[in-house]
């Protein structure tokens, strides 16, 4: 931590050493993301937003707030084709079903990031009514082994997650998995092992697909992150 330059990323125009910062003008918003709130039913180690059953720093978004931005994306032709919902745990937000329904009604693809635990299972009958080819539930599973998954998410989380995952599978939802490269496995080996996990539970997935199994590279807070300058364009 002593070698980290905390003067970085403060000026939108220049880097810490005064160089011109590189940026690309946004031409469209392909995926419009909403954080539904920081509350979550569990508390994971190293959560990027420190979600927990007590953290309500980001209060719940309301349906009317989400509708406002979706309508703006449509009216301004922003090139949006997908609506994403993250948290916290999105299924804890009482308006999430209305948000999903409205997004689908406007012919958007919808991606919901969830731990597939009790908040989702508590509304499963209503969620079932929204099952649609354009809806994808991406389930967070930190490892295919129960012990490693619970090392991050806490005791008694794996079996409940599996109950939700198997419910999605048996009811023919479109779903995907998101995992982490946390234990030193090479990505190819991780995907092979996940395919064994998939076969074991008869899941309708292929771990070789980067859309069906998303892997996240671990970020080290102790490493100084470089800033990108216009000189980097010569590398491309």
Positions of PLM-derived features:
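Conserved alpha-helical substructure of the radical SAM core
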Residues: 2-87, 91-109
């Amino acid at each position: 931590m002593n070698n980290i330059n905390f003067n970085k990323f403060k000026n939108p125009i220049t880097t810490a050493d005064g160089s011109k910062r590189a940026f690309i003008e946004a031409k469209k918003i392909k995926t419009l993301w909403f954080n539904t709130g920081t509350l979550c039913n569990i508390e994971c180690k190293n959560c990027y937003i420190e979600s927990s059953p007590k953290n309500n720093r980001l209060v719940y978004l309301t349906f009317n707030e989400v509708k406002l931005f979706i309508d703006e994306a449509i009216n301004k032709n922003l090139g949006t084709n997908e609506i994403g919902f993250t948290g916290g745990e999105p299924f804890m937000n009482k308006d999430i079903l209305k948000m999903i329904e409205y997004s689908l009604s406007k012919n958007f693809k919808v991606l919901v990031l969830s731990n597939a635990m009790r908040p989702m299972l508590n509304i499963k009958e209503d969620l079932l009514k929204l099952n649609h080819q354009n809806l994808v539930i991406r389930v967070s599973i930190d490892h295919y082994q129960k012990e490693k998954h619970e090392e991050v998410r806490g005791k008694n989380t794996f079996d409940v997650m599996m109950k939700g995952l198997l419910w999605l599978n048996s009811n023919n939802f479109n779903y995907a998995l998101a995992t982490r490269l946390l234990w030193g496995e090479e990505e190819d080996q991780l995907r092979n092992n996940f395919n064994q996990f998939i076969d074991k539970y008869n899941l309708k997935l292929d771990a070789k697909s980067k859309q069906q199994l998303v892997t996240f590279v671990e970020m080290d807070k102790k490493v100084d992150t470089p800033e990108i300058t216009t000189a980097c364009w010569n590398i491309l």
